[in-house]
A protein has these predicted regions:
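Bacterial N-terminal signal peptides that target proteins for export
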Residues: 2-14
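Bacterial N-terminal signal peptides
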Residues: 11-23
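Terminal connector regions
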Residues: 113-147
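Low-complexity, Pro/Ser/Thr- and charge-rich linker/hinge segments at domain boundaries
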Residues: 137-168
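Short beta-strand elements that form the blades of beta-propeller/WD-repeat-like
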Residues: 163-187, 212-228, 259-279
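Surface-exposed loop/turn elements that mediate protein-protein interactions on large endomembrane-trafficking
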Residues: 184-204, 233-251, 278-299
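Repeated scaffold domains used in trafficking and secretory/extracellular systems
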Residues: 204-213, 250-264
Length: 300
């Protein structure tokens, strides 16, 4: 008859195996989060991937493992057909994480998946390590894509001197309701050629003042909207290159009424009744120095 090991020895072996398994399963902690829940269709959906090294030693997440890239993003539609992965999506470079360190990386889900349709989507990140058999899987994170509401649209040509082809361009100005409020967007696309720029987020808008949208003499787009009670944003988008810029205005006088965008007799656009705010004026005031607890009040 084969002798049995002492009960206390068997107990120690089981504890050691459990400790080893626990060490392997707790090497890293991963989280995936979206800063907001709703995005316009085609708007970059940026998620934050946080990885905490709990292995007690420095680790390197390699660019590629036997089971594929070290970071694998999975996107599924909550209802309907799931989106298709892009063929040439960007790769994740190797990541060095010190013991006990937490690192964050931004992941644009639209760089990895083609998501042209509105809907709700479930996203997970799988982190693969050569030393661990099963990948680390994040809890699901959710986001919704919404087509928004088109409030203005026009199709224009591209001036010859800009040499951007003969295909006309279509501008669209869109509102999107989010939990944080109503936000204004613009789109620029060449529908005949089948391409479009990612949507431009123009900022939060006040519904009390409808946005003004016009094109200038070179067919560049200008959108003027109220962002706050006496804060107005002017956005310009170049018809050929898609480059954009913004300027901020306020009323000339407290009782002077709201500024407006107007077309001058020569066709140029101008802001009437508004003063442009400089970058210096937009900076928040410096916080006053707080008294130390050791400072004695005056007179003591």
């Amino acid at each position: 008859m084969t002798p049995r090991p002492p009960a206390n020895l068997l107990h120690r072996v089981l504890l050691l195996l459990a400790a080893l398994c626990g060490t392997l399963s707790a090497q890293i902690n991963v989280e995936l989060q979206f800063p907001r829940s709703t995005y316009l269709v085609d708007e970059p959906a940026l998620a934050t991937l946080r990885i905490t090294n709990m292995a007690g030693r420095d680790i390197v997440l390699g660019e590629k493992t036997q089971n594929g890239p070290w970071c694998q993003i999975q996107v599924q539609a909550v209802h309907g057909s799931s989106p298709t992965p892009r063929q040439n999506s960007p790769s994740f470079p190797p990541l060095f994480i010190r013991a006990g360190e937490t690192v964050s990386r931004s992941v644009n889900v639209l760089d990895i998946y083609d998501i042209p349709s509105p809907g709700q989507y479930r996203v997970r990140a799988n982190i693969v390590m050569e030393s661990v058999r099963d990948p680390y899987v994040t809890a699901p994170a959710y986001f919704t894509t919404d087509p928004g509401k088109v409030i203005w649209s026009t199709t224009v040509g591209v001036p010859e001197e800009k040499s951007a082809g003969d295909s006309p361009r279509t501008y669209s100005v869109i509102t999107l309701k989010r939990r944080e409020g109503v936000f204004l967007y613009a789109k620029l696309e060449a529908r005949q050629d089948g391409w479009r720029f990612p949507p431009y987020q123009l900022g939060r808008m006040l519904s009390a003042m409808p946005p003004q949208s016009q094109t200038d003499r070179e067919n560049n787009l200008y959108v003027f909207h109220a962002a706050e009670d006496d804060l107005y944003t002017l956005t310009q988008i170049d018809v050929a290159t898609g480059r954009s810029g913004q300027a901020v205005y306020r009323s000339k006088t407290p009782k002077g009424g709201r500024p407006r965008m107007e077309r001058l007799p020569d066709g140029r656009l101008a802001i009437s009744g508004g003063i442009r705010i400089t970058d210096e004026e937009m900076k928040p005031p410096a916080a006053a120095d707080r008294a130390k607890l050791s400072d004695r009040p005056q007179g003591f």
